[in-house]
Amino acid sequence: GRYSEIPREMLESGDFVTPHLNYVAYFEKPVLHYWLTALSFEVLGQNEFAARFFPAVLAMAGVFVVYWLADRMYGPRAAFLSAWILATSLVYFAIGQINITDMPLSFFMTLSSAGFWMGYRRDRRYFVLFYLGMALGLLTKGLVGVVLPAGVAFWWIVLTRKWEVVREALYLPGLALFFLVGTPWFVLVCMKNPDFFDFFFIQEHFLRYTTKMHGRFEPWWWFIPIIIVGSIPWTGFLPGAIASALPSSIASRTRQDRGKIFLLLWFGIIFLFFSISNSKLIPYIVPVMPPLAILMGSFLDLNMDRGKTRSLGM
């Protein structure tokens, strides 16, 4: 596929700024995924294993980030359950073996959201991960890698009224890292290719999202059955996990409820964003799986303590 051919042509030509597909400039996606695959080809050879290597590695890395975050939010048992649920969920497991940009994007968005939460709860320096994840997401799939993590953080601050987090999150080293990592390639590719800006930001962002130009239109509810099937074998726990997070989150502002609000927003904003879009593909929904896994893992952990695991099917 093109995600293997473009890196191969990069290695052949030595041009690591302008992606080419069949020796024609190709601007549908940013460059990071091509760079990672080219590195894999250079080290492991140009073969199928090398092409799939980095998506698989980043899928596993996403599992570890979910464990880390869930451990800090709910404890080690919930962390283990969350990580196990994520690693074995059908859609996450499947997409992690395919050489496309969606799993890398999911990992960088997960890293960003985890960095935001840890920056708020533990140490301001973790906000560096918030900005680094957005920068790498930007280089992987464009503005979606910034808009969604930033949107989750923004709406969480609004709903919880934690206005002081705005000042804390505007962390100068993190902001500097974002621009240092995320912007140089865009400057270089625009200098070499004056038509890049219009094609990439107007056609591939605004028009792809708001029109049916790519012929990938589906109804707004299309991702609901994808999530249901994609959560197999854990689908049965989804309704309870989401329902148990809703009432207390709305009713109070305790530390635990702020965590539930954060996870629900993380899931809900990504889900709504892609559901509204006029361009839909199954892999787009992968980034909702990490917050869903933590919701389900913490739900199971809580019900184990209450002795309800038998009624939950365990």
Where are these regions (language model features)?
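Membrane-integral, polyisoprenol-dependent glycosyltransferases
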Residues: 1-310
